């Protein structure tokens, strides 16, 4: 490009460089989208806009992509490197109005006909200044936002710092030419498909128009289900119909979000400023699969694990910066206090009570509101655990909202609903001290403004944050596979509860928890905490800690827990340096070197971070424990031992493998442990390697407390086969608390009620106990003896003496 156009662009770029601060989606387009910069690249934009073109240019230059203003030379032919699908008023003939775009597509395709080695990558790019969906006023949402010059000027002026450049995966023009030909009709089809692509992309980024709140309430009141619930309310409480209707409206006011794009923008600015000061980085993985689902028209339901109140803000912030619509979020009614409640409501929160029992009107209003969100196409987010995990492990899922999601599908008319499991990880959780107190029996403090201010005042260096998107679960596909005749239950009026609903919801919930754990993120803090807590003195020399971290890292890299899990690329030494900056550990120096210590008062809190990745290391830890105890053991016997204990571990930690997959996993882990020199393999037997016995012992310690807990329950069951489930849970906790005191076990979840409740349910499912409570003493004693070999003799004596003392 030369002459007047170049001067014009330079002049136009002066104000744009000041007013526009755009963000690229994805953050690093070339590697994330697989663009090959050694091959020709041309850009396709939805409509003629110089501001968009220059904003794209700035991002291309920042990411080492070809300059869109520099023409492509192919076989002596000069062609513009960009194409506008929709035309507009032109200043120079250099611009390409709509009919020109078809000609340009044809020219590019024609060059592929004459040059068999040519393969131009066509990259669709949309530039968005602001993402306000607007309010419903009857007009149809335009497929592309065409702004004239004056409108564009004000959009840039007001929204220049809220602009996004969205790069889409490239389309190979070579493949297009080979499969569809190169004539003009193919060029026209290409332009038409591009227009549809941009319309879908805009909907995925901006979302459907927002309803006026009163219009939404009126529509809900007119629904058959709520009208019937209002009549029932009036009859059962002996109040007038008007009063019952007012009660319904009051519930809608309590529940419904009041989404505000301006509040999203303001919060984005504040959070952007805050994150940069609190977090050293927010790591996002597998977002492209979610963008693709949104682009394909799926109704997205985000199902993250729940670690902290920070989850609400972090996930919405991440989604917004990934070019997706911030979802409507189901938040606990405990967060509806001033000023947080009104702010969260404008950020998309809708509030949910802890229980629906005994309030038919409330449950009907909530279910209809959720169904309305789905039918309008809004993305939704809820925490399937029901509350924040106090231990760092996933909680057993609460299935109420998930059940309502499937009931919404049974009303018919919704787009395909896809559940997106999300793992959220932190190197520092601000509530972790409060969690430890609550697990020790302290009363949960009610959320309030003073409590919020105290929490904010404690915010310091939070390290790294992690948001990993797990494997999506399309509900329609799942139901087609597991409940082939589910469509027979569709009822557009009534909320139906077919017989298959509860077991199916339970299975989906369990599957979601597994998928969340599959997307686990190892980081400096949880790895260092795992190693230091494995040491009985909670201290290791720097060399020992480095060796232990290398063991964990190699296991996770060479035998990955799943394809969705992430492991740091940094070295063990770099991870230790980073963890030390978090000020959780003490360092003592002597003439030999550094000793890294986890102070006693911190040890209880640090179990939280260890538990975040317990599922990723528990199988190699169990293998290490078995090999350490037996000194040498055949693969077959090792496999038998793992097979006996695996169902309990799978249920407790939501592990991903089925029993029939275990032999291959055990073999892969054994080979990796041999490669690391932790064990030797001789004649199909695993032997300890004395040179690395400490590393193996520390690895084995990762399963120590879990095995002790199982030993308690199996001993109680063997000693009293007729014990009922409730008493078994209670007595197991009592012995665990005693063990914790006598043997200095610092993990609060060691005697957590939920952990023992889950274990006893698994024992029932595995046939160790029946619903009537009777156990098979021979079987339970066999398992106890297996466990007794894996725990120390002093712990075993404490367990056995506890029950003898009671007798």
Swiss-Prot record:
InterPro entries from the UniProt entry: GPAT/DHAPAT, GPAT/DHAPAT_C, GPAT/DHAPAT_LPLAT, GPAT_PlsB, Plipid/glycerol_acylTrfase
Top-rank taxon, per record: Bacteria
EC numbers, comma separated: 2.3.1.15
Effect of residue 385 to R: Strongly reduced acyltransferase activity
Pathway per the UniProt entry: Phospholipid metabolism; CDP-diacylglycerol biosynthesis; CDP-diacylglycerol from sn-glycerol 3-phosphate: step 1/3
Effect of residue 421 to S: Reduced acyltransferase activity
pH-activity note: Optimum pH is 8.5.
Cellular localisation: Cell inner membrane
Reactions performed catalytically: sn-glycerol 3-phosphate + an acyl-CoA = a 1-acyl-sn-glycero-3-phosphate + CoA; sn-glycerol 3-phosphate + hexadecanoyl-CoA = 1-hexadecanoyl-sn-glycero-3-phosphate + CoA
Residues spanning the membrane: none
Substitution effect: residue 351 to A: Strongly reduced acyltransferase activity
GO biological process: CDP-diacylglycerol biosynthetic process; fatty acid metabolic process; phospholipid biosynthetic process
SMART domains: PlsC
Effect after changing residue 306 to A: Abolishes acyltransferase activity
GO CC, one annotated term: plasma membrane
Consequence of substituting residue 386 to L: Reduced acyltransferase activity
One GO MF term attached to the UniProt entry: glycerol-3-phosphate O-acyltransferase activity
Main location: membrane
Membrane topology designation: Peripheral membrane protein
Keywords: Acyltransferase, Cell inner membrane, Cell membrane, Lipid biosynthesis, Lipid metabolism, Membrane, Phospholipid biosynthesis, Phospholipid metabolism, Transferase
Pfam families assigned: Acyltransferase (PF01553), GPAT_C (PF19277)
Family: Belongs to the GPAT/DAPAT family.
Domain free text: The HXXXXD motif is essential for acyltransferase activity and may constitute the binding site for the phosphate moiety of the glycerol-3-phosphate.
PANTHER family for the chain: DIHYDROXYACETONE PHOSPHATE ACYLTRANSFERASE, GLYCEROL-3-PHOSPHATE ACYLTRANSFERASE
Subunit (UniProt): Interacts with ACP, YbgC and PssA, forming altogether a complex at the inner membrane.
Protein name listed in UniProt: Glycerol-3-phosphate acyltransferase
